[in-house]
């Protein structure tokens, strides 16, 4: 069976821009995500 192409092509700049802290702080929903992760005690808040 033929498998599909590798879909994960790591790129640190894109990772930060799409999931990073500054992007999260931009929107109300993003700030809520960071707050929830702080409440839960996550070591990593964002990418």
Curated annotation (Swiss-Prot):
Entry superkingdom: Bacteria
InterPro entries given in the database record: Ribosomal_bL34, Ribosomal_bL34_CS
A Pfam short name: Ribosomal_L34
GO BP: any one term: translation
A GO molecular-function descriptor: structural constituent of ribosome
CC per GO annotation: ribonucleoprotein complex; ribosome
Gene3D superfamilies tied to this protein: 1.10.287.3980
Keyword check for Metal-binding: no
Keywords: Ribonucleoprotein, Ribosomal protein
PANTHER family in UniProt: LARGE RIBOSOMAL SUBUNIT PROTEIN BL34M, MITOCHONDRIAL RIBOSOMAL PROTEIN 34 FAMILY MEMBER
NCBIfam families: rpmH_bact
Protein family membership: Belongs to the bacterial ribosomal protein bL34 family.
HAMAP family: Ribosomal_bL34 (MF_00391)
Name this protein carries in UniProt: Large ribosomal subunit protein bL34
Natural source organism: Corynebacterium glutamicum (strain ATCC 13032 / DSM 20300 / JCM 1318 / BCRC 11384 / CCUG 27702 / LMG 3730 / NBRC 12168 / NCIMB 10025 / NRRL B-2784 / 534)
Lineage: Bacteria, Bacillati, Actinomycetota, Actinomycetes, Mycobacteriales
């Amino acid at each position: 069976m033929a498998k599909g192409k590798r879909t994960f092509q790591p790129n640190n700049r894109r990772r930060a821009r799409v999931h990073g802290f500054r992007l999260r702080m931009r929107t109300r929903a993003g700030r809520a995500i960071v707050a929830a992760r702080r409440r839960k005690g996550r070591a990593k808040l964002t990418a």
